[in-house]
Amino acid sequence: EGKSTLVKAIMGEIDYEGTLQLGHNCLIGYFAQNQAALLDGELTVFQTIDEIAVGDARTRVKDLLGAFMFSGDTIEKKVKVLSGGEKTRLAMIKLLLQPVNLLILDEPTNHLDIKTKDILKDALKAFDGTIILVSHDRDFLDGLADKVFEFGNKRVRGHFEDINGFLKNK
């Protein structure tokens, strides 16, 4: 009830009433629910990442792909033949390579298996910035979120505790 709408407002995708103010020098990276569908199916896995990697990241492309379970012949596969989970992992690598300080993730664990969720969670823990994460996946949020914003009855309530504290006190 309003979570994805908030994300769309922050991203400037919809009109809204009121004021929305982002911090100074805020650089946003956005992972939409359909992010994997936006990949170029004709590129290989390696080409998809290599085309956006700049500077120091260029030397780490294969390591980064390996961290997200792409190795060997897999990196030469065309994106169009990848499974939904593989495409989601690839889209997440693209996002993590962008020079951003605010990540907005709208249901990023859809189509992911447990191992991939763990890899993503570790990558997000290592992110040096702010994360706005829309998710119903309590296990994924455990140990990742330190504030919870509850949407309901046309209101947003902030809870300055982790997901377990929020659920316990609800």
Language model features with spans:
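ABC ATP-binding cassette signature C-motif
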Residues: 1-170
